[in-house]
Swiss-Prot record:
Transmembrane segments: none annotated. It is found in: Cytoplasm. GO terms for biological process: peptide biosynthetic process. InterPro entries: Elong-fact-P_C, NA-bd_OB-fold, Rib_uL2_dom2, Transl_elong_fac_P/YeiP, Transl_elong_KOW-like, Transl_elong_P/YeiP_cen, Transl_elong_P/YeiP_CS, Transl_elongation_fac_P. Signal peptide: none annotated. The keyword Ion transport does not apply. Belongs to the elongation factor P family. The keyword Ribonucleoprotein does not apply. It comes from the Bacteria. One of its GO terms (molecular function) is translation elongation factor activity. This is Elongation factor P. Its main location: cytoplasm. Pathway: Protein biosynthesis; polypeptide chain elongation. It comes from Persephonella marina (strain DSM 14350 / EX-H1).
């Protein structure tokens, strides 16, 4: 059994146990209604299934922190079924099924350092860096003067993913993307 904490100590990206399953806290909200007891509404992602649920706790409740191994690894390659990662300290290779990565796989780049979460030796989750730099390999050309950032166009990046970018972005440009949302952050000059 893991460590228990008061629900008021919950933080984003914390790992908790709910109904015997490990969850990652995506967001939370302390609610203090005019009448009745305060409560905490938690939006959490099941680390095994990927399902996102909302859980409501009374402010007096405590929660159990999930207890599993976290290892920093580097992405190596995809073999059609699994994504392979290498532990930079030991040289160990770990295969992570595509189902565990889900949509995050579209932002994986060779050599990218990630955190792999293991439950009894089995990979149950992967955390990519919050943002990363990608090269635009395909998009409609931008025109001089197109500096408005509110209008977006699709662009294919070097991992094959398609993201929305401002009109002034051209093929060959390097851009920073939020890997959690897939949103454009900024153009990078290298």
């Amino acid at each position: 059994m893991g460590v228990k904490i008061g629900i008021n100590q919950i933080k984003k990206d914390m790992f908790i146990v709910h109904d015997g399953q490990p969850y990652r806290v995506l967001d939370y909200d302390h609610v203090k209604p005019g009448k009745g007891q305060a409560f905490v509404r938690v939006k959490a992602k099941n680390m095994k299934t990927g399902n996102v649920i909302e859980i409501t706790y009374k402010s007096s409740e405590s929660i159990e922190l999930a207890d599993f191994e976290q290892r920093q690894m580097s992405y190596s390659y995809f073999d059609g079924d699994s994504y392979w990662f290498i532990d930079m300290n030991t040289g160990d290779m770990i295969a992570v099924p595509a189902s565990v990565l889900g949509d995050e796989a579209q932002f994986l780049k060779e050599g990218m350092e990630v955190f792999i979460f293991l439950d009894k030796g089995q990979p149950i989750g992967v955390e990519l860096p919050k943002s990363a730099v990608y090269e635009v390999i395909e998009t409609e050309p931008g025109f001089k003067g197109d500096t408005a950032t509110s209008t977006l166009k699709p662009a294919k990046i070097d991992t094959g993913a398609t993201v929305q970018v401002p009109l002034f972005i051209n093929e060959g440009d390097k851009i920073k993307i939020d890997t959690r949302t897939g949103k454009y952050i900024e153009r990078v000059n290298e």
